[in-house]
């Protein structure tokens, strides 16, 4: 019986092991301007004297859908509307870590809209996270992505848009690129991949893939297949790999690798500047 169940259990066990780093509390620091990796990591250190704070606010993107977290672009008051980055949370949900990521993007001059695919819920331990992730309805989540994109274009008047996500959110950043032909760029941090060129050919956006060589849930062989699929589909892409483990860019997790995270963030900043601001 156990041997027959292994093919079913193994993918779930790998996902649980890869994402198991439990979130830590964070403080209410309010950075101005671009954030270095050290400054970003400091947001996740426990400070019991100050409640968690964020620079943005929750907004309704469509009736009946969970609110999204909106962090307006910093330093653009009175100027033209800023490009918008759709932010997709990890398997923990739309928690403080993701709000800090949105604020970090806002510090770069982009308006960040963090979507909630968990209906307002978030996890405090890996078992809760796995249950929430498994309960996600694909069709309902696609509606949320489409509503977020519509809000970005019609309400925020975004001249350009991109998506970014990590782990669970990395997969959904890829799904954003498949769903939204008008998307300019998609950043995928170690998310579940699709390697079928026929499906990938629907992507019009440029793709940046960030992966970890020690990742057992998204192993290098899967990244190789993804890269081959993108090439065969004619998708403009670049792939970067780091000698780190899954979730290495999350300062609130136990697998955080500051060197790899800093290098990946440098690539992400450059990529977003190219696809959203038109910088070389």
Regions found by a protein language model. Name each.
Residues 16-18:
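C-terminal motif of bacterial Sec signal peptides marking the signal peptidase cleavage site
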Residues 22-154, 250-252:
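Serine-hydrolase catalytic machinery in alpha/beta-hydrolase-like enzymes
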Residues 101, 219-229:
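Short alpha-helix in the alpha/beta-hydrolase fold that links the catalytic acid
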Residues 156-166:
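Alpha/beta-hydrolase fold nucleophile elbow
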Residues 165-169, 173:
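Gly/Ala-rich beta-loop-alpha elbow adjacent to hydrolase catalytic centers
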Residues 209-211:
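Short beta-strand/loop motif that positions the catalytic acidic residue
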Residues 214-218:
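Acidic catalytic loop of the alpha/beta-hydrolase fold
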Residues 231-280:
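C-terminal catalytic histidine-bearing segment of alpha/beta-hydrolase fold enzymes
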